[in-house]
Amino acid sequence: MVMAPIPQPWHQWPFLILFFLVLFSCESNLPCRNGVEATQRVFLYPQSPKVSSIVSKGYRTGYHFQPPKNWINDPNGPMYYNGIYHEFYQYNPNGSVWGNIVWGHSVSTDLINWIRLEPAIEGNTPSDINGCWTGSATILTGDQPVIIYTGADTEKRQVQNIVLPKNRSDPYLREWTKPKNNPLIEPVGPGLNSNQFRDPTTGWIGPDGLWRIAVGAELNGYSAALLYKSKDFMQWTRVDHPLYSSNASNMWECPDFFAVLPGKNNGLDLSAAIPNGAKHVLKMSLDSCDKYMIGVYDLKHDMFVPDTVLDDRRLWLRIDYGNYYASKSFFDSKKGRRIIWGWTNETDSTSDDVAKGWAGIHAIPRTIWLDGDGKRLLQWPIEEVESLRRNEVSHQGLELKKGDLFEIKGTDTLQADVEIDFELTSIDAADPFDPSWLLDTEKHCREADASVHGGLGPFGLVVLASDNMDEHTTVHFRVYKSEQKYMVLLCSDLRRSSLRPGLYTPAYGGFFEYDLEKEKKISLRTLIDRSAVESFGGGGRACIMARVYPAAVVDGATHMYAFNNGSSTVKVSQLKAWSMTRAQVNVRKG
């Protein structure tokens, strides 16, 4: 399809002046809260009265996971069993705010199109009467699936319970039963806070043949992943030391523990022998962010040992630098990969959520593996999402000089998948890097936004832009030189994403190290889904999930551009964009 030619800077100056002036005038926002709150709350939001709103339909996503209506938060117990993918989730069947939580349940054969089922777990026994919260699935020896989850008992203590499928011959595993010996694990022991003891992990087998799980906890005022052992997955004994603990924080939610191989995107099954050379990852949810450490699992001492110990948790690695929390991974035995899911909350108001009748989505499932140098996880949307692509638009060899803005036409800009390779013509133009920026990347993205000229960057995408550009979201790179290496900053700036008041509109950002002398180019992939903008920079080295609510989405008219506002010219060696058709997400009930 024929596209408009690349505009020359003098053709675009009135337009660009408006674009960069409105960027420059944005107010700053508080760092790293992401509009996300703790997932296991012991209070209920008051039910707001229904109000009329223009947001009732326009912002509902077309291919991200969400129930037909009401509130959703953490993904729970994802697994692949007998040809079916299962996704459980924290769900309020009675409203679009947090409360009345049960385990929703949906099934799929491709992780994209989903059939909804009746809730799998409800709080109706003494060990979960005050809440049935996050947990994990494990496939035991003999092909037996089980789920361990946190319940709030009659005393409102957080305890760990188990459920078993009532009929394993049912391909959808619709019904689950609770053994009478629940709870399996209680919050006993010195220094353990009974109200901060939750979210058990998937089980793994140690060198002694015993099963293990970790549970997030506050121990003596600090964060810990407590370690438990069992022969039969029913009788559990707490190990006398945590899997890992840190005095840099006071509570870890939703811990995850899994093995990865450097440079290989095949996943590892924790219930099988782990090959030599594998690394282990300990992921935790805190500060409204999902963070992780890479290290080794010391089998002799039954402990996780990180490669690098950082006392400042602001320097811990991030799964995602945007609105992404409570992630859960699982081994997909069908394709031999590890997949991770995360929850993305709304960042509009509670009254908006009530008016919409729904709140919360899950990010696109991502394949996750370890970079070849063993220093960082890489993430990429699962290949199945590509089945939704339609109407491909392609460009090669485009040149973007300082101030150039190139409109990408021929795709549905409300639901799109865009992949761009930016080729750098002069990496020597990179500005010097200041390590202090790592302590607050959002602040740096605000101060060095798309209106601020740099040596290399900003360059990237403008998405969900209104006709006159008074609403737009930028996803862009900046390149810096740090001693003998290059640091790349990926920003997703939401501060001009909407004219609507009362929204949380930060400038998200994250750095990653990149060998530009070898690669010479940086890739960007962005999935646009009405109110979701999900970006992957540098082949998945930095990921940013964002929620936006432009009025232009409701009007059904938005634009998308590639741009460069750096002093050095960048080339778009490859640009591909597709319209994304709507997935069948929980439309049908099974």
From Swiss-Prot:
Cross-referenced PROSITE patterns, in alphabetical order? GLYCOSYL_HYDROL_F32
Main location per the UniProt record: secreted
**GO process terms (BP):** carbohydrate metabolic process
Catalysed reaction(s)?
Hydrolysis of terminal non-reducing beta-D-fructofuranoside residues in beta-D-fructofuranosides
Intracellular or extracellular location(s): Secreted, Extracellular space, Apoplast; Secreted, Cell wall
* Signal sequence interval, chain numbering: 1-28
Enzyme class at the top of the EC tree: hydrolase
Q: Which cystines does this chain contain?
A: 445-491
Residues listed as glycosylation sites in the UniProt record: 94, 167, 247, 345, 565
The induction annotation reads:
By rice blast fungus (M.grisea) 12 hours after infection.
The EC number of this protein is 3.2.1.26
Q: Show the Pfam families listed in the entry.
A: Glyco_hydro_32C (PF08244), Glyco_hydro_32N (PF00251)
Quote the cellular component terms of the Gene Ontology held in the record. apoplast
GO molecular-function terms, A-Z: beta-fructofuranosidase activity
Q: Which residues form the active site?
A: 74
Q: Which tissues is it found in, per the record?
A: Expressed in leaves. Expressed at moderate levels in roots and flowers, and weakly in seeds.
Keywords, A to Z? Apoplast, Cell wall, Disulfide bond, Glycoprotein, Glycosidase, Hydrolase, Secreted, Signal
Enumerate the residues binding substrate.
71-74, 90, 98, 133-134, 198-199, 253, 287
| Purpose of the protein | May play a role in sucrose partitioning during seed development and in stress response.
Q: Which family does it belong to?
A: Belongs to the glycosyl hydrolase 32 family.
This chain's protein is named Beta-fructofuranosidase, insoluble isoenzyme 4
Specify the species: Oryza sativa subsp. japonica (Rice)
Taxon lineage: Eukaryota, Viridiplantae, Streptophyta, Embryophyta, Tracheophyta
Name of encoding gene: CIN4
